[in-house]
Amino acid sequence: MKIMGLDPGLNCTGWSILSVSKDIKLIDKGTVVTNSKEDTGQRLRKIHTDVLDILRLYQVDSASMEEIFINKNPKSSISLCYARGILLLTLSTKDIPVFEYSTNYVKKSITGNGHAKKEQVSFMIEKILNVKCSGTYDISDSIAVALCHAYSKKSF
């Protein structure tokens, strides 16, 4: 089974693909980065088309992302909602079910502590999957939510 983990953002969306069978392996990871000088519609189109390309390449069975949270900055929250919405639409066009988990649940499933810092989550991902979490926290957050989904489904 292949799981796509997503960390939505209008500026940068992190993604990862896990293969789950007898064990869990990280197949690929990356980010979709949009140009802040473009209008919102163009940026959402880029997220949509890039994620569609990834879905075509990896043929995932399910996807996971963190539940929405309301930021102190309303503009940031709205941008996050735009990115989440386009991801949900993109996944639904391919009939890929999406599973959502709270931030605290994801952190607890990876580190044992629902209030762990991003550095702790990244460290544990490296230990669990025996990979280097280079790049942004957008990537490690996407891996964490995919791993959380694999654990919650006991798919391996």
UniProtKB/Swiss-Prot annotation:
Its cofactor is Mg(2+). Binds 2 Mg(2+) ion per subunit. The RuvA-RuvB-RuvC complex processes Holliday junction (HJ) DNA during genetic recombination and DNA repair. Endonuclease that resolves HJ intermediates. Cleaves cruciform DNA by making single-stranded nicks across the HJ at symmetrical positions within the homologous arms, yielding a 5'-phosphate and a 3'-hydroxyl group; requires a central core of homology in the junction. The consensus cleavage sequence is 5'-(A/T)TT(C/G)-3'. Cleavage occurs on the 3'-side of the TT dinucleotide at the point of strand exchange. It comes from Ehrlichia chaffeensis (strain ATCC CRL-10679 / Arkansas). It comes from the Bacteria. The active site is at 7, 66, 138. Its EC number is 3.1.21.10. Pfam families: RuvC (PF02075). One of its GO terms (cellular component) is Holliday junction resolvase complex. Signal peptide: none annotated. GO terms for biological process: DNA recombination; DNA repair. Belongs to the RuvC family. InterPro entries: RNaseH-like_sf, RNaseH_sf, X-over_junc_endoDNase_RuvC. This is Crossover junction endodeoxyribonuclease RuvC. Homodimer which binds Holliday junction (HJ) DNA. The HJ becomes 2-fold symmetrical on binding to RuvC with unstacked arms; it has a different conformation from HJ DNA in complex with RuvA. In the full resolvosome a probable DNA-RuvA(4)-RuvB(12)-RuvC(2) complex forms which resolves the HJ. It is found in: Cytoplasm. Keywords: Cytoplasm, DNA damage, DNA recombination, DNA repair, DNA-binding, Endonuclease, Hydrolase, Magnesium, Metal-binding, Nuclease. Mg(2+) 1 binds at residues 7, 138.
